[in-house]
Amino acid sequence: MLPRLAKSSLIQQVRGVSAIANAEPSGPSISTSIPGPKSKALKQEMDKVHQTTSVRFHVDYEKSFGNYVVDADGNALLDVYTQISSLPLGYNHPDLVKVASQPHLITSLVSRPALGSFPRTDFADGISHALTSIAPKGLKAVQTMLCGTSANENAIKTAFIWYQAQRRGGLGPDALHLESCMNQQKPGTPNLSVMGFEGAFHGRSLCMLSVTRSKPIHKVDIPAFDWPIAKFPRYKYPLDQNVAYNKKQDQECLADVEAKISEWKRRDNDVAAIIVEPIQAEGGDHYGSPAFFQGLRDITSKHGIVFIVDEVQTGGGATGDIWAHDHWNLSSPPDMVTFSKKLLTGGYFYGEHLRVKEAYRIYNTWMGDPTKLLLLEKAVEVIKRDGLIEQSREVGAEFQKRLGELQASSGGKLDQARGRGTFAAVDFPSGSLRDKFVDLAISNGLHCGGCGDRSLRFRPSLVYTKKHLDLTFDLLDKTLKGL
Amino acid sequence: MLPRLAKSSLIQQVRGVSAIANAEPSGPSISTSIPGPKSKALKQEMDKVHQTTSVRFHVDYEKSFGNYVVDADGNALLDVYTQISSLPLGYNHPDLVKVASQPHLITSLVSRPALGSFPRTDFADGISHALTSIAPKGLKAVQTMLCGTSANENAIKTAFIWYQAQRRGGLGPDALHLESCMNQQKPGTPNLSVMGFEGAFHGRSLCMLSVTRSKPIHKVDIPAFDWPIAKFPRYKYPLDQNVAYNKKQDQECLADVEAKISEWKRRDNDVAAIIVEPIQAEGGDHYGSPAFFQGLRDITSKHGIVFIVDEVQTGGGATGDIWAHDHWNLSSPPDMVTFSKKLLTGGYFYGEHLRVKEAYRIYNTWMGDPTKLLLLEKAVEVIKRDGLIEQSREVGAEFQKRLGELQASSGGKLDQARGRGTFAAVDFPSGSLRDKFVDLAISNGLHCGGCGDRSLRFRPSLVYTKKHLDLTFDLLDKTLKGL
């Protein structure tokens, strides 16, 4: 392995006094409505050249720090939404800012490799530190991609390639397959399907939308593959008071999975893979039990179906484990685990049996982005050094307790408080009341967000501590009273 | 608009003496076989954690500069392949290295926005300088995405959304559409298709593979949408000696387009969009004439079909125009133009009629990467300042002339020399001979690459000058003689 070029401490020193914020405020400070006049003016400018329909407010990223996002008007909000759960260490973490000064990051940025063909000399080293060191149990091989959607797309392609190879007795494509695929005829272009679940979200490409059932606005007007969708458990909370009901949910859903595998087989459209989130996040924070997922593992093993766990939103530590599926105690590991968001780079881990033997089948120009891998390498180091997963577990336990208490005192406005670690949600009676609550919370200095039809979700980063928790619940309480 | 934070000249000064190369060698220097012993050792390391089937050699990106790529073993090659045509200004361009020092780039890197909801204060400014300033005639609105594939996917989604709105008299989705799409039933999930062309390459997601016909290994074992593929012209060269033959190609291909539009309409699977490359690059550098593309524009206008030009490989100036479709002189602009690679960020320009009115329909967490936009802003400034498109046109004219002469003197080894600007190709009698030539050229210090079944392609960056051209043809001549 070649040595890394030394960091220049002079660069860091200069950077340290630059215009990037380097400390958290002691609390939120709000001086305008949100969006304020500057955010509104920027949105008008932006609308001339780019869609703005989903823009909430513009952010001053130079002034944001830690758990606090600062908007264009100088309002500082405690952020428990963190760019849709995609910041592992909050804003402008000093260790990441330092990495940004290093020559190997700069060259990664300005001389971007086609890494499937011409990787950087430090690529394997980066993969080992950033990803192999946090690999899910049983899955050492990894492939980087640019985002969660491309991770899922390529995981599914890998599953199809494996499934077809199994049909050929383990062999690669023969002349007949290679010829027929150019006309999209069998056997080269097979009928194969992927099973998703009601409420699932796996991305917005046409393939991923075919297994996504989060919201109509995500899917309407877009053609889709005719792939099976099975039921996903809908538990009642608290769990310990609804054991029988919830167990029946698991059984019904697993029976539905089995039935649809058979149905699609009869329709000559075999299920090659099942893709599932540990917690259906965009769809409304719906949880599955370890027993449910163990059932899925057993069914997929029995039928020779690739079992893909989509940890794009759950991976990275906020659930109190680096992977949300860690606590399932499966009899054997999932075949693939996909990731993105908090892990900065997209990608997937896979079992060695799925490694594609032929070149250029899982391939594209960039196959990820080495700048993200270098940042992740440092982020993982910080997460381990500072015990941030343990912190999420501890602060998360307190979060769950407090959320339950808030619900109990809400006079029926809140329901179904649930979560793992700091990854948490609670339901409102309606979507409109939830939306009103989010707006009011933002104006009170707490940046939270919705998911599903009427859920409020919490997605703080890993630098969220007890002090931020206390402030969060003060602001939630205040907002609830003002609703 | 808020002012950008000032650059620190001290940072730049420090950076200038760092370990990043800042000058080109006078010519190639080769001291080992390629891949050499260090590249081979790195590949072995990499293979433990990541697929390596397509890896040619490892690159020392800190030592690479301008038109020269330096491999792990210290070999310096003149690079006319440039990371599969994705470097606009070669390696480690000093102006881009400077941008990497700026606080707004660093915060973009370490505090990445969910830019559809919380954009940076300088986002509209960056869009205007980086993209609007080079917008294709008639298309001012733009959407950034992460890569060429996601650009094409979202362009196609936009086309579907528009096509369905037209069917509803310009209206958004109603309750029936919203409800039915969750079960993937009509009318919410329509039967709609996209037309591609024989030899096309638009990316490797399942949707894009359905309109891709580059090579069997890209498509085999992957399920696909049943979408129409029309014939694409296959011209004979030189063009001025094959006018009648080539004109007939255009006519036959356009008739095929018309016939397949009708056929898919009869099958209740309307063609909502046609996607086409100006030059089919991965498929083997196949060109269409201005008359062919004018015919496509006329047909799509007549049928109310969205006309998408995929400039992922051609966009950015190497053809002697910023957009390869600039010289078609269409009666009206394309409806959409997609881009990536040399433009550093993915994305697409679109006509205002295609702007999606409802929020969260064209959306995802990141929707691009602001670091790439900031780099592109500087790259566009350099391209204009240094007259690099004009340079590509001039050097390109000489390149075409010399390639024709090389072919004439090749004793039948080369055929079909063709190109625009420095974007050029030539054919070998077989794929195996082409592959042998590429290997030998690399060992002689010229990094070129293949495309299609038996073509050699040239993809220098925009900093390629007459001096590099002379060296290129010396090396081509030497390699051809050694073949």
From Swiss-Prot, chains A, B:
Binding positions for substrate per the UniProt entry: R204
Superkingdom as given in the UniProt entry: Eukaryota
PROSITE patterns linked: AA_TRANSFER_CLASS_3
Localization terms from the record: Mitochondrion matrix
GO biological process: gamma-aminobutyric acid catabolic process
Binding positions (pyridoxal 5'-phosphate): G148, T149, T365
Alphabetical list of SUPFAM superfamilies matching this protein: PLP-dependent transferases
One Pfam family hit: Aminotran_3
InterPro entries: 4NH2But_aminotransferase_euk, Aminotrans_3, Aminotrans_3_PPA_site, PyrdxlP-dep_Trfase, PyrdxlP-dep_Trfase_major, PyrdxlP-dep_Trfase_small
In-chain residues carrying the UniProt-annotated modification N6-(pyridoxal phosphate)lysine: K341
UniProt main location, coarse: mitochondrion
Recorded family membership: Belongs to the class-III pyridoxal-phosphate-dependent aminotransferase family.
Oligomer status and interactors: Homodimer.
Protein name: Probable 4-aminobutyrate aminotransferase, mitochondrial
Originating organism: Caenorhabditis elegans
Record gene name: gta-1
